[in-house]
A protein has these predicted regions:
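N-terminal helical cap/lid subdomain that shapes the substrate entry/recognition surface
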Residues: 5-118, 130
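Asp-based, Mg2+/Mn2+-dependent phosphohydrolase catalytic module
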Residues: 1-13, 23, 46, 94-100, ...
Length: 252
């Protein structure tokens, strides 16, 4: 891969969902600790934070790149039951009760469990006013479109591509290419923004899109093309992409 600088008008911006548009409030580990306490277990939020991080790392290591981790919409519950079992197994080897599973599932599918970052609405309004196409590309459950609708974000997006519905996910190129086709744009005319170096930054670039990493907490200083806030992409609307902001287009 040889980086080249090409000024191409950005006609569309794709956004990741979690840690880009939305964040859980209260934090995930606090919710798990509270629900597990209903089964008689006593874990701190720190305990859960470590167990969740270790479980996600193991799941990602086992996944085939781009494979839908849920096995389609019908496999979502099975995936999360197995995930919860692994989390609890790391903590004390205990069993997650059906009631605990249902409480967690209901919580995270509710609008009230999620908040929209303060920089989201201003940038969406700005880009929409500039006639820039907008889409969501996310590795998420099938309820994401309803969640976006509940927060009033759906009207901004021409399409929402969700891995559980698409049957493919990031970093695989297919989900990016499908979204490009739905908006009628070529990959080089798209900027993708998300928080995952692998799924968002590398995945989008591998599909021929431009990409920036949204690094809200300054965790990835090794990635040159990163931003700390969505407001930093406002300058791309309606004109050629700034190479210093958006980075190089991948080529072989």
């Amino acid at each position: 891969m040889i980086p080249v600088r090409v000024r191409v008008r950005v006609r569309a911006v794709f956004f990741d969902a979690g840690a880009t548009l939305l964040y859980p409030d209260p934090p995930v580990e606090e919710v798990y600790a509270r629900v597990f306490s209903g089964d008689g277990a006593r874990f701190t939020a720190g305990d859960l934070r470590d167990a969740l991080a270790a479980t996600w790392a193991a799941v990602q290591a086992e996944e085939k790149d781009g494979g839908d981790r849920y096995g389609g919409v019908r496999g979502e519950a099975e995936f999360w039951r197995a995930f919860l079992t692994r989390v609890r197994g790391l903590l004390d080897g205990g069993v997650v009760s059906p009631a605990a599973f249902e409480r967690l599932a209901a919580h995270f599918r509710s609008r009230e469990a999620w908040r929209v970052y303060p920089d989201v609405l201003p940038i969406l309004e700005h880009l929409k006013a500039a006639d820039v196409g907008l889409a969501v590309v996310s590795n998420w459950d099938s309820f994401l479109p309803r969640l976006l609708e509940g927060h009033g974000l759906s009207p901004f997006f021409q399409t929402v591509s969700v891995s559980a519905i698409e049957g493919t996910g990031k970093p695989e190129a297919e989900i990016f290419r499908r979204t490009c086709a739905r908006l009628g744009v070529s990959p080089e005319e798209v900027l993708h923004v998300g928080d995952s170096p692998r799924d968002d930054y590398e995945g989008a670039r591998g599909a021929g899109l431009r990409a920036v990493l949204l690094d809200r907490d300054d965790r990835h200083p090794h990635v040159a093309e990163r931003i700390r806030s969505l407001s930093e992409i406002a300058g791309i609307a309606g004109r050629a992409a700034r190479p210093d902001l958006i980075g190089s287009a991948p080529t072989s």
